[in-house]
């Protein structure tokens, strides 16, 4: 193998190695189930935080501009002008009586321990919608340490028409998510995943830098002896 072939094949091999690392990382089930992803929504991009483990499905994004789920925190974006109100249903599937007292956000002021709760946000304010949703979900979630069992919270978000009833296309649930929350265990997984990501990114940057230097830095060529 000539020196010219070696100089040509080394950058190609480095590039193939970088692509293989990226492909393995993207297809690894352990990472794929934790990291989340960028996904096109009704308008703009939806970022699902990779620190939360979830199983999400989008059927209809007509009423929400963006929906983001991070653990048990749900942040709803601006509703569309056609269906300005957002209906959120939260179901806590943990063992009965294991959670804290849930506060009814509908305005009755009564404290109860429901398994399923439903609330309609009559607002177009992103901040108000987010705060109300966080308050509702916090009533089910509480705070957990590493020794406590995991619990599952199912969250459904759907648009509501002006008259307060679902009609037409709004009958379809645009966002359905299931997330298992155990704070201590998740924190351990998150730290491990971040470490693996940092190592992978460092290796990728190093290989890319070597490739750039190899291709861009001029090489000193030895002069051939002059033969008379």
From Swiss-Prot:
TM ranges: 197-217
GO cellular component: host cell membrane; membrane
Signal peptide range in chain numbering: 1-26
Broad class of the protein's primary localization: host cell
Keyword Transmembrane helix: yes
Protein's membrane topology: Single-pass type I membrane protein
Protein's cellular compartments: Host membrane
Keywords: Glycoprotein, Host membrane, Membrane, Signal, Transmembrane, Transmembrane helix
Residue ranges, compositional bias (Polar residues): 78-97
Protein name: Protein K8.1
